[in-house]
Curated annotation (Swiss-Prot):
UniProt record, GO biological process: DNA repair; DNA replication
Residues annotated to bind Mg(2+): G25, E45
Domain of life: Bacteria
Keywords carried by this UniProt record: DNA damage, DNA repair, DNA replication, Hydrolase, Magnesium, Metal-binding, Mutator protein
Taxonomic lineage from the root: Bacteria, Pseudomonadati, Pseudomonadota, Gammaproteobacteria, Enterobacterales
Function: Specifically hydrolyzes both 8-oxo-deoxyguanosine triphosphate (8-oxo-dGTP) and 8-oxo-guanosine triphosphate (8-oxo-GTP) to the related monophosphates, thereby cleaning up the nucleotide pools and preventing misincorporation of 8-oxoGua into DNA and RNA. It prevents replicational errors by removing an oxidatively damaged form of guanine (8-oxo-dGTP) from DNA and the nucleotide pool. 8-oxo-dGTP can be inserted opposite dA and dC residues of template DNA with almost equal efficiency thus leading to A.T to G.C transversions.
Record motif Nudix box, residues: 26-47
Cofactor: Mg(2+)
Molecular functions per Gene Ontology: 8-oxo-7,8-dihydrodeoxyguanosine triphosphate pyrophosphatase activity; 8-oxo-7,8-dihydroguanosine triphosphate pyrophosphatase activity; 8-oxo-dGDP phosphatase activity; 8-oxo-GDP phosphatase activity; metal ion binding
Family: Belongs to the Nudix hydrolase family.
Broad class of enzyme this protein falls into: hydrolase
Protein name listed in UniProt: 8-oxo-dGTP diphosphatase
Gene (name only): mutT
InterPro entries: MutT-like, NUDIX_hydrolase-like_dom_sf, NUDIX_hydrolase_CS, NUDIX_hydrolase_dom
Amino acid sequence: MELLSKKKVYITRGKYKKNIWEFPGGKVKKHENIVHALKRELLEEVGIIVLKINFFQYIEYIYPEKKIKLYFFLKKKWKGRPYSIEGYTYLWKRLCHLRALDFPLANHSVINALKKNNILIKFR
């Protein structure tokens, strides 16, 4: 789940691996659909109310210990000022600078897709 603003992407330090950067997001609860989970997680973690989103990419990634499913959405419009409610370090980074940071392996393909599609210009 990417927050995009003025050609920059909102990222935060990982909850479980402090040296890894992540896009905001979380797990879908049993009673939720993906969009409800997205809105809940962003309100809980980043303090914003999502007003407009666009589906971007679905990824299944297999780590040695587990298989994960990731749904990436682009948040085009929101209410509130994004910050880390849970107190994790966060940054607004230009897409061209993301490769210099450590991200989970599962996120590499979405970073490449954002760059390839010039998303930050299309969706700002």
